[in-house]
Amino acid sequence: MNQASTVHQLSQQLRAHASQAQIDQALHKPVIILSAPRSGSTLLFEYLTQLQGTSCIGGESHRVFRNFPHLRAENKALDSASLNEAHADPRCIELFRDNMGSLLRDISQQSFAQNPALFLQQPKRLIEKTPRNALNIPFLNKVFPDAKFIFLHRAPQQNIASIIEAWTLGLRTGRFMTFPGLPGWDRPGWCFLLPPGWRDLVGRSLAEIAAFQWRMSNQTIIQNLAKLPAEKYCK
């Protein structure tokens, strides 16, 4: 089954059981964690999803993004993995929300797709955490216009050291690798999020790559959150 078929099949399966109103209720005011890679966002995500009244899709949303070919990267030239409002046309928004809804689970592992009415007996807020979210705020804000963003920041020394460690492991094992065989790149693949300007890192050390990812992640988050009302985010 190709990616487009998967997207539409998941949407159809969800809508066979859930109404539009129920889908909107399940995705009401999601909490989206923003951070550089290796900033402790997994720990925060795991803490929040153990609280009553929360839901999640069981992990990071790479599997949802992966089903939408035009959301893999900014453009076909792979200039970055940054997404903006233009990537979120009305049909994409509907299908993306449906695909997220199809994976929703609460703390007791109750599935929204299997029994929407039971799932919605108690209000729940989706907790979403994926490193690439740092580059996708305009897109996410259009898909989830009532979202609340949490900006998690970690000091550069520890954060960059952790990114270097993860890259070392990723190049050896494939873990953390988001763009294997990236055209124009001088290593087996690229790990974590792909910011604009990544080609300038060809031939550079892992320390320089890690520092670049830390800087671009935090800089992009700060710049995009500054365009939103203050009540839309917290640090």
Question: What are the residue ranges of the model-derived segments?
Answer:
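PAPS-dependent sulfotransferase catalytic core
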Residues: 1-111, 170, 185
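PAPS-dependent sulfotransferase catalytic domain
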Residues: 69-71, 120-235
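Short N-terminal edge-element motif at the start of the domain
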Residues: 114-117
